[in-house]
Amino acid sequence: MGLLCSRNRRYNDADAEENAQTAEIERRIELETKAEKHIQKLLLLGAGESGKSTIFKQIKLLFQTGFDEAELKSYLPVIHANVYQTIKLLHDGSKEFAQNDVDSSKYVISNENKEIGEKLLEIGGRLDYPYLSKELAQEIENLWKDPAIQETYARGSELQIPDCTDYFMENLQRLSDANYVPTKEDVLYARVRTTGVVEIQFSPVGENKKSGEVYRLFDVGGQRNERRKWIHLFEGVSAVIFCAAISEYDQTLFEDENRNRMMETKELFEWILKQPCFEKTSFMLFLNKFDIFEKKILKVPLNVCEWFKDYQPVSTGKQEIEHAYEFVKKKFEESYFQSTAPDRVDRVFKIYRTTALDQKVVKKTFKLVDETLRRRNLLEAGLL
């Protein structure tokens, strides 16, 4: 009898312990669920090369702890790969122009750089790139300064030349230092195509200030084959941040060189606006890469893009830049209203001029986004 009572006590004690553990797990799940309700979900969407991932990295620098040394070092092979890939693209481009252009002679690489060019072409075609040594950096610099490569670079919009080209080519000696560790600025310029989904949690006013909202920002791949991965993220979104690279009105897609990037952006923007799950979702449109746009617009007419074919320049210099920007902005506004159901046009829609590489601009923009969304939440709660 005593043995039976002892066993029962052990079983009862085990049951009580298990019940306590279950209750604790349920309590934690309930707390986490409540906490999740206070976290607003933001989707960062846009076509490939729109600057989404640069904005994502800026958020990490601005509103989190930034990149530690290990993370900075992890970008070293990426940056070196960007250098090798870019010089290969330029070398390939110069060959193509030399064969097909009427004024072909100016695209022919000088005799002293031909051997270097072939060597770098072979390296750029490898799957694994060597460490960027001082010798290789000097050879790349020599080829970069070759008149034929500079003429090719001037036609970069016809090729797939990345925006980071100037920056990395100007810093080759530093990038090839034996003890080189990438800087924060280097990381912002580094180009890696986003595949899948990455996320970050932040507050634009700082974690210790109760007045600010907490956001979870999702960055998803912009190339066409990545977009199917967005679907499961569509539910319960507080706002969509759509990035449009306005400087790319004369460029083609990485994945389809017959397709204009701005036309692709327009169609993607309209498709997202029409999704039923976004009927009540706020939209923040970032007209990005303004720094490149303001230089390009003075050289390349806006009406080379089919969407902007009715554009008429009115001035020169700064006035023309503003006129062109306002025209693009108006086109996106028209697209928004044409793609939004009449009973939903009152949902929050804001447009911001952005330069993803400019930390001050990104910080100011996200504080404005935060204010807009907090105001919307107060209105919905009947507190305004």
Swiss-Prot record:
Q: Pfam families, per this entry?
A: G-alpha
Highest rank taxon of the organism: Eukaryota
GO BP, sorted A to Z: adenylate cyclase-modulating G protein-coupled receptor signaling pathway
Give the matching SMART domains: G_alpha (SM00275)
Tell me the segments the record calls region G2 motif: 186-194
Q: What are the record's GO terms for cellular component?
A: cytoplasm; heterotrimeric G-protein complex
Q: Which InterPro entries match?
A: Gprotein_alpha_su, GproteinA_insert, P-loop_NTPase, Plant_Gprotein_alpha
Cofactor(s) needed by this chain:
Mg(2+)
Output the Gene Ontology terms for molecular function: G protein-coupled receptor binding; G-protein beta/gamma-subunit complex binding; GTP binding; GTPase activity; metal ion binding
N-myristoyl glycine lipid sites: 2
Renumbered residue ranges of the record's region G1 motif: 41-54
Q: Where is this region: G3 motif?
A: 215-224
Annotated GTP binding lies at 49-54, 163, 188-189, 194, 222, 288-289, 291, 356
Q: Where is the lipid attached (S-palmitoyl cysteine)?
A: 5
Renumbered residue ranges of the record's region G5 motif: 354-359
Q: Which residues form a coiled coil?
A: none
Q: What the record says about its domains?
A: The helical domain (70-190) is required for self-activation.
Stated family: Belongs to the G-alpha family.
This molecule's function is given as: Guanine nucleotide-binding proteins (G proteins) are involved as modulators or transducers in various transmembrane signaling systems.
Q: What is this protein called?
A: Guanine nucleotide-binding protein alpha-2 subunit
- Annotated source species: Glycine max
